[in-house]
Amino acid sequence: MTPVVALVGRPNVGKSTLFNRLTRTRDALVADFPGLTRDRKYGQAKLGELEFIVVDTGGIDGTEEGIELKMAEQSLLAIEEADVVLFMVDARAGLTAADQAIAEHLRKTHKKVFLVANKTDGIDGDSAVSEFYGLALGEVYQMAAAHGRGVLSLLELALAPHLETLVDAATQETAQDEEEEDFDEEALLRMVAAGELDTKEDTKETPFADLPIKFAIVGRPNVGKSTLTNRMLGEDRVIVYDMPGTTRDSVYIPMERDEQKYVIIDTAGVRRRGKVHETVEKFSVIKTLKAIEDANVCLLVIDAQETITDQDLSILGFVLNTGRSVVLVVNKWDGLDQKVKEDVKNELDRRLGFIDFARVHFISALHGSGVGHLFESIQEAYQSATRRTSTAMLTRIMQMAQEDHQPPMVNGRRVKLKYAHAGGYNPPRIVIHGNQLNDLPDSYKRYLINYFRKSLKIMGTPVRVEFQESANPFEGKKNTLTLSQERQRKRLLKAKAKK
């Protein structure tokens, strides 16, 4: 489960500075959602290989009107759903009444809170932070967010349990990969040169084959997510089911269809069918982001009557950035006349042409039309994302791509692609080795991605292709001269000296 870190504190203590430092590898992901203040920020950050969501809660000032009145509803929700809370104070300004009011609220939440004294650069930090121990929140961690001092050590401490879980999972996956495929690079290159690649048993079932497919139904409020969830589950089912460990997260609902097990991750709060008429869905950005991270496949629900909005694109961008498979679901399709339907399809083609690999379904969640076909696309996307393909097959496809369209010339030399192998799954990641790959134009990279996608019949999931320069075996080595070459060199040097 992707951890969530909430940044809490009164204005101007450095929350935005820390937020920008943590999310430097990615832009802020979500903004302008209904019910959120304009300065609310949600972003994705990384600590090593651990991805986590960071939330700048903002809007907390703890004035005499009371912390409960001045804290926005979404800020309360962010703190409630966070795994870790970083309570930031200003070491230069000292302890204020606002800090005390916020601390009092945080103590009531029983959350794991780290008290962070920011702006300790250029001052005696130990003396400056001493008064903050009176907040009774334990150790006070010194930081200079503007310069990055103290940030890494604090994150490693705060996210230690999640890092341990990640290391354990990575160790198991590495061991499994080593068992499944261990190729000799030199032997492979000889086979490539001799045209002896064996592409039999080119694909194999993954260790995910027996696991249920987790899919998340995501989208803006009031596009019909709850209606679709209930329709997919069936009318007569008691549908509220919290699996262990999900009390603060979305509802996880196990189900089975045609002997295939699924888990629906519902972000809207699932209701009995009799209550589907309620117009306002409980909506949490954090729940949506965490559901996307945890899912294998995401069903992005779009309102046909409103077509594509910037909010839809924001959610879609997060899905693609996290590498999740996606199925586009255009809901409320019934009742539209033919002219409007054509306009909607044209708008989808115009604004979503960059994800032509995703299946698009036009449905009515309320009446059930088209809903049954969603399961076919979910399975297709999941199998495409998790199928394992041999090095021999990937290398052969790469060769065919070169035969159909040669790489360009760079500085008078043609870019050379040597071999390809799998670098990961969910999403599929292909690593290509060769020479001068750093000079390969983006247009040819896109060509290769599309060629692999078409050859492997990959639908519903992004494909990532990485390029690695092959090592030069002579780099850093001096050329050893033979005895006759050494004598000739000495004669030339002596003749040059006489001149």
Swiss-Prot record:
Associates with the 50S ribosomal subunit. PANTHER family: GTPASE DER. It comes from Aeromonas hydrophila subsp. hydrophila (strain ATCC 7966 / DSM 30187 / BCRC 13018 / CCUG 14551 / JCM 1027 / KCTC 2358 / NCIMB 9240 / NCTC 8049). Belongs to the TRAFAC class TrmE-Era-EngA-EngB-Septin-like GTPase superfamily. EngA (Der) GTPase family. It comes from the Bacteria. One of its GO terms (molecular function) is GTP binding. This is GTPase Der. GTP 2 binds at residues 219-226, 266-270, 331-334.
